[in-house]
Amino acid sequence: MKEKILILNGSFCEIPLIEEAQRLGYYVVTTGNAPDLIGHKYADEYIPADYSNGEAILSLVKENDIRHVISCANDFGVLTAAYVSEKLGLPGHDSFEVAKTLHLKDLFKEYTAKHGIPAPISTVFVNEEDAKEYIKTAKYPIIVKATDLTGGKGILKAENEKEAIYAIENAFSASRSKHIVIEPFITGVQQTFVSFLQNKKVVSYTGCNSYSPINPYLIQAETLPAEGLDEIARPLIAIIENIAEELSLADGVFAFQLIRNGKDFHIIEMMRRPFGNQFLQLVEDNTDFPWHTAQLYAQLGLDGSALPRIPKKRPFCGHHGIMAPRNGTVKHYEIPKEIEKHIYEKVEINPPGSEITNCMNERIAYIFYEYESLEEMNEAVKTFNERITVEMA
């Protein structure tokens, strides 16, 4: 009989993990409170539950003879997987305290400040009045963030006190824990540096440029590898390996989002999980490392150090989320032939006929593309929103 594993969520982001786990011989159960997500159709079984609720998932695991918990492309999934695994003595995850330190923005910024890691200096607030008093003397622009959300939720930039008041109210309203951080707004090029840890050492890495032309707090497109990757790889690897040693991190993905100014950088977020938008598939195509298999091995508590390297498929690749210009019903979208010829995969999330209720966050489709050079790709991607037409009813 196959061992049961639980993957926390079943969006299209989790499909590669679901398929790889099945290939490895596991019976895959997915969960989450959105039963219509496409990933659930790929699983062997779907059991509804709120994957951000640690106690609910703990009960689900106990009641269904599940042997391992796999985190999803969301920070709440990382926290729940760590919590449940710690309670049941399951391998493959950081301790719950470490997971909170790394994935809650206020705790992570305290950690970076304590250890001299280059990051914006953050001030943490647990009530609105203190935050609103602070902004009276703040140096603008600032950025206000809920500490426990992802995907650009609960984040706003403020140029003045009036905007800051609105940003504070927005962040507190969005945050589950009612914790927010306020920090200086750092300008520069946004990039992601993604690495894989085995025995607390980085064994593979790459990076990407990140583009957010529609919603400045939501990445819409990414191109791999990052421009100037070699200039920042060594210091970032040193930071990651130092954190891994000090916090005794489990094997698996470790990534930073950062703002670059030449060789200087500020770390703004970190993640120990697969990203949304099937980003790990791009990373796998752009390197010679089997990221999905290795991530599953890590969270199953298996030794992945002997996993064979794979051919590097796509030296210059990326993805872009097609977004609607306004809310409404998607009638039609069209990708020009000049872009189409570079696309090797397209995934429709909200096809024609679908209703868009939040055009600043929802995607109509994801396109995955490759080019002959990094320069050509980066220039092309900047024009995608102008050239890809979307008709709404």
PLM features: residue spans?
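Short beta-strand-to-loop capping motifs
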Residues: 158-160, 195, 322-326, 367-373
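Short, well-ordered beta-strand elements within core beta-sheets of diverse protein domains
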Residues: 184, 228, 364-372
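A conserved helix-loop-beta module that forms one wall/lid of the active-site cleft
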Residues: 86-154
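Internal nucleotide-binding/catalytic subdomain
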Residues: 155-265
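Conserved short beta-strand edge segments in small beta-sheet-based binding/regulatory domains
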Residues: 182, 343-348, 389-393
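ATP-binding N-terminal substructure of ATP-dependent carboxylate-amine bond-forming enzymes
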Residues: 1-97, 129, 302, 324, ...
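Active-site "cap" helix and flanking loop/linker of ATP-utilizing ligase/carboxylase catalytic domains
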Residues: 235-256, 261, 271-327
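Glycine-rich active-site loop/lid that clamps phosphate-bearing ligands
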Residues: 322-352
